[in-house]
């Protein structure tokens, strides 16, 4: 999964057929955990019987919180913030203004283009991002506004001008930091699927970009300007 197809060499067909993922998700090798008969059966059922195409990255935060014990949650400040509460911050911060500008632009092509350029330059930073819920919601809301702009300009097939690297975060622990990055990748794919169609979404999804925009470290000790260029 971390090796391009043209340099994989001699591999069994069932391995060679896997897509090249890249993006650092499969860079390292890990020892496989030992599964009991029951846990193996449950894992297979999760992979084969559940529909993962509609997985909601918004809930990753609550999932992480659910598997952590009470003491760990308290010491690390792991408190899941719901989508409505996140929007209470994002809406007055900049989303309401973007929606007002969209309403004012109407069908004016030049104003719509200027608004799209503005959206593409907005940077969102969360110095305690956890599993990325705040960043994911911000990204999805901005993609929704961009999709309306593209629709009014009759450019629904257009590649998004909002890069994931505009959404930066710092998280103390490695695992939630990786979850935050994965959640944003899933959000990008789902937005492409919703606004551009399955063909374009699948064609451009893989391989993933290897750049990492979620930093694992102590936000009180890091230089924020170096993390948010």
Question: Where are the language model's segments positioned?
Answer:
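Non-catalytic, mostly N-terminal accessory regions of nucleic-acid modification and defense proteins
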Residues: 1-97, 192-202
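SAM-dependent methyltransferase catalytic region
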Residues: 65, 69-229
């Amino acid at each position: 999964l971390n090796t391009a197809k043209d340099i994989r060499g001699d591999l069994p067909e069932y391995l060679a057929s896997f897509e090249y993922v890249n993006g650092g998700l499969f860079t390292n090798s890990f020892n496989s955990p030992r599964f009991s008969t029951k846990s193996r059966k449950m894992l297979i059922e999760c992979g084969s019987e559940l529909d993962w195409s509609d997985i909601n990255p918004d809930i990753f935060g609550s999932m992480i919180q659910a598997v952590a014990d009470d003491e760990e949650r308290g010491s690390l400040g792991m408190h899941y913030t719901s989508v409505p509460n996140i929007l209470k911050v994002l809406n007055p911060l900049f989303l309401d203004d973007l929606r007002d500008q969209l309403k004012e632009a109407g069908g004016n092509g030049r104003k719509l283009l200027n608004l799209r350029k503005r959206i593409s330059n907005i940077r969102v930073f969360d110095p305690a991002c956890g599993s990325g819920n705040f960043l994911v919601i911000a990204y999805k809301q901005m993609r929704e506004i961009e999709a309306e702009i593209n629709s009014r300009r009759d450019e629904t097939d257009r590649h998004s001008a909002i890069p994931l690297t505009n959404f930066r975060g710092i998280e103390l622990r490695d695992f939630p930091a990786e979850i935050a990055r994965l959640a944003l990748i899933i959000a990008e794919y789902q937005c492409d699927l919703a606004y551009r169609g399955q063909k374009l979404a699948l064609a451009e999804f893989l391989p993933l970009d290897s750049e990492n925009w979620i930093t694992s470290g102590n936000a009180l000790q890091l230089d924020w300007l170096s993390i948010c260029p």
